[in-house]
């Protein structure tokens, strides 16, 4: 975003208790809020496989385990919606990517709907998001409304059936509705198969799922980035350091990876 000429304000691990002052520290954004709950799935990071609270968060200063809520994308988004009701909210990162359609929640032992429904956010960027964040910023700067951004690849949004671009057509994959999956486990299994297959295709189809009288629409991903595009992203002058807020504190995960190099990129599933 900075390379494209935009200013980015980063608020790390805001305090979600009390008066929400952390969410107001840097004021109202000109274009949109972007929410990412972290490099690891937030619930895996917070709980063990036995559903016990972990004693340490390797991604937090001094390993503290109490600096992020459960499902931070949902918590942060609802707070921002309360404070700035008319500012667009875009979810990204592994938490939203893996919850973009009906999904099984291991900790609640139930099926949950597309995370946009609970977070009251406007859009999800799934997978790697270098192109989408810039495209969204450019569209909003040119006067587009967030609800009209239905054409950006590798994004997810909710809309009514009549507002789906080109309508539901034979090239789309129409999944069983969320409500149907709640009553039939086989429907969820069939959905999961389609989602996995499309996530691994070079040329994927658009996926739609009915939920709460609207549709979750998953646009196909961007084509694989070229060598020049990958180099352009990774050659930017990153500091590769923790946020200045954590100066003087130890972040266990950073100590482990601070001399590491990238050898691969995340896939389009997450």
Spans of model-derived segments:
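Glycine-rich beta-alpha loop elements in corrinoid/cobalamin-binding modules
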Residues: 12-212, 218-223
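Catalytic alpha/large subunits of respiratory electron-transfer oxidoreductases
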Residues: 1-2, 33
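N-terminal [4Fe-4S]-dependent radical SAM core
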Residues: 190-263
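Generic, well-ordered alpha-helical scaffold segments in large soluble proteins
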Residues: 4, 79, 83, 136-140, ...
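Generic beta-strand/beta-sheet core signal
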Residues: 11, 92, 126-127, 233-236, ...
């Amino acid at each position: 975003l900075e390379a494209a000429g935009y200013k980015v304000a980063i608020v790390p691990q805001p305090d979600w208790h009390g008066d929400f002052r952390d969410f107001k520290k840097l004021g109202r954004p000109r274009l949109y809020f972007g929410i990412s709950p972290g490099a690891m799935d937030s619930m895996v990071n917070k709980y063990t496989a036995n559903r016990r609270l972990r004693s340490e968060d390797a991604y937090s200063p001094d390993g503290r385990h109490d600096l992020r809520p459960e499902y931070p994308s949902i918590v942060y988004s609802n707070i921002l919606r309360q404070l700035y009701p008319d500012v667009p909210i875009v979810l990204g990162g592994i938490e939203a990517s893996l919850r973009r359609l009906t999904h099984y929640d291991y900790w609640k032992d139930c099926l949950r709907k597309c995370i946009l429904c609970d977070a009251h956010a406007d859009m999800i960027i799934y997978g790697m998001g270098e192109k989408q964040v810039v495209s969204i910023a450019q569209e909003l700067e040119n006067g587009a409304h967030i609800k009209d951004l239905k054409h950006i690849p590798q994004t997810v949004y909710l809309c009514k059936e009549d507002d789906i671009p080109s309508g539901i057509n034979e090239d789309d994959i129409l999944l069983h509705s969320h409500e149907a999956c709640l009553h039939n486990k086989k429907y969820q299994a069939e959905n999961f198969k389609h989602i996995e297959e499309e996530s691994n295709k070079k040329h994927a189809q658009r996926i739609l799922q009915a939920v709460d009288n609207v549709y979750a629409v998953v646009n196909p991903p961007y084509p694989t980035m070229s060598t020049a595009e990958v180099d352009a992203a990774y050659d930017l002058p990153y500091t590769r350091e923790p946020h200045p807020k954590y100066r003087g504190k130890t972040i266990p995960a950073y100590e482990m990876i601070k001399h590491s190099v990238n050898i691969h990129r995340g896939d389009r599933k997450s």
